[in-house]
């Protein structure tokens, strides 16, 4: 794919804009390119592993990476690539895109960019703020349609979830791209209505201990929210250490990517804003 590379100096360092057909302009720095190459080199010997094992290998490369919220909230809307700092969903998305790219015969940063766009934006097309998949449930649906993974919550022992979607459209002041844009709010409301028409499952906190045996290392764990109208409160990558099930995540309390020091069941029992989990299994 032909890309036009434009380099310019900004206050925070070197920024590169890659013009990609159908993807809009990608925003990243030379440090992101260097970090990509470091990770590809580190996991090159593991590229033939099943995806659930490979994504854990990739995730370990980012232990200690600073937690920073809001890195995508720049205007105009462009595909932002940031391997230097992350939040919870971007960490999982980044690890999945990197693991997929590592399996290429010749992994390239351009291929990584394309995969990020396919995961993050509706139909892989950057077309303004509302084209981004803001609700994790839509991210899960699209990733399933594209063959990256399959939700297995029901098969893991889950229960029906009466999930409502309304938080973004009813709290526009919480989002600068919605606060003064009735048109954007209307588009988000349409997304919410579509998501509302689907069926959902979750493993409630009280059932997690019994169902945990069905969760594998490398599964994506999405923590369901107790906030009205909001689907997912947090997300990470499951990790089995002996008989213990924990997870790797970008932690707000630790301010960095960590292997959670307590088991999954113990972690969620102490978080009032989380009602249970959904389980997404990466295709091999």
Positions of predicted regions on the chain:
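Positively charged n-region of N-terminal signal peptides that target proteins for export
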Residues: 1-4
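Bacterial N-terminal signal peptides
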Residues: 7-15
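Sec/Tat signal peptide C-region and signal peptidase I cleavage site
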Residues: 16-20
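Cationic-aromatic interfacial patches
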Residues: 21-93
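Acidic/His-rich structured neighborhood in mature extracellular/periplasmic domains
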Residues: 62-196, 240, 249-252
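Beta-rich nucleic-acid/ligand-interaction surfaces
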Residues: 114-118, 207-213
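Short alpha-helix capping/helix-loop boundary micro-motifs
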Residues: 200-211, 225
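C-terminal soluble interaction/assembly domains
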Residues: 216-284
């Amino acid at each position: 794919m032909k890309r036009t590379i434009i380099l310019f100096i900004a206050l925070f360092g070197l920024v590169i804009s890659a013009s990609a057909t159908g993807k809009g302009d990608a925003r990243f720095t030379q440090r992101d390119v260097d970090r990509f190459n470091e990770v590809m080199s580190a996991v090159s010997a593991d590229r033939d592993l099943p995806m659930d094992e490979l994504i854990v290998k990739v995730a370990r490369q980012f232990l200690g990476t600073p937690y920073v919220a809001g890195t995508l909230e720049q205007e105009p809307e462009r595909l932002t690539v940031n391997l230097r700092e992350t939040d919870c969903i971007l960490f999982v998305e980044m690890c999945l895109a990197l693991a997929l790219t590592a399996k290429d015969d010749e992994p390239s940063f351009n291929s990584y960019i394309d995969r990020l766009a396919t995961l993050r934006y509706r139909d892989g097309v950057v077309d303004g703020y509302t084209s981004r998949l803001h609700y994790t449930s839509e991210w899960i649906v699209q990733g399933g349609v594209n063959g990256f993974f399959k939700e297995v919550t029901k098969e893991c022992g889950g229960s029906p979830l009466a999930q409502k979607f309304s938080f973004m459209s009813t709290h526009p002041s919480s989002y600068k791209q919605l606060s003064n844009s009735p048109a954007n709010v209307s588009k988000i409301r349409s997304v919410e209505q579509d998501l509302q028409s689907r069926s959902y499952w979750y493993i409630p906190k009280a059932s997690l201990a019994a169902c945990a045996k069905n969760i594998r290392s490398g599964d994506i764990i999405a923590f369901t929210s107790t906030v009205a109208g909001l689907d997912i409160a947090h997300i990470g990558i499951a990790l089995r250490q002996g008989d213990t099930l924990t997870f790797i995540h970008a932690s707000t309390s630790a301010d960095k990517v960590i292997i959670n020091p307590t088991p999954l069941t113990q972690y969620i029992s102490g978080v009032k804003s989380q009602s249970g989990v959904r389980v997404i299994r990466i295709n091999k």
